[in-house]
Amino acid sequence: MAEEGQVIGIHKVEEFDTLVKLGNEAGKLIVVDFTASWCPPCRFIAPIFAELAKANVNVIFLKVDVDEVKEIAEKYGVNAMPTFVFLKDENEIHRIVGADKVQLGNKVAELARSAAASATSSA
């Protein structure tokens, strides 16, 4: 898998599917940032998302440009950017729409703890 502590840019549906599958097999939380190059709030939140990735190496952070990989955005019904989709065991468990750095940070911390606890108890 890619480097821990980094945001992984997705450029193909196959990349996304592979990383989600690997993350699910490892019992990891996956956070997907649906973004667009022309979106000012997306540019605002990008460095914060990157810092969250560095601070939460047990979580997989993916970035999907909705104009580049439309199929993934359509699959998840994304129609506003940024949208953050939280996945666990191939299921969406939470969604945040908008560049709310406090809400994003709190939810990543909460769900990362929960994912780590469930991975430990099932090991």
Describe these PLM feature segments.
Residues 9-29, 70:
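A short beta-strand-turn-helix
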Residues 15, 36-37, 68, 89-91, ...:
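Conserved beta-strand elements of beta-rich interaction domains across eukaryotes
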Residues 15, 44, 103-106:
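Acidic, Ser/Thr-rich intrinsically disordered and amphipathic helical segments
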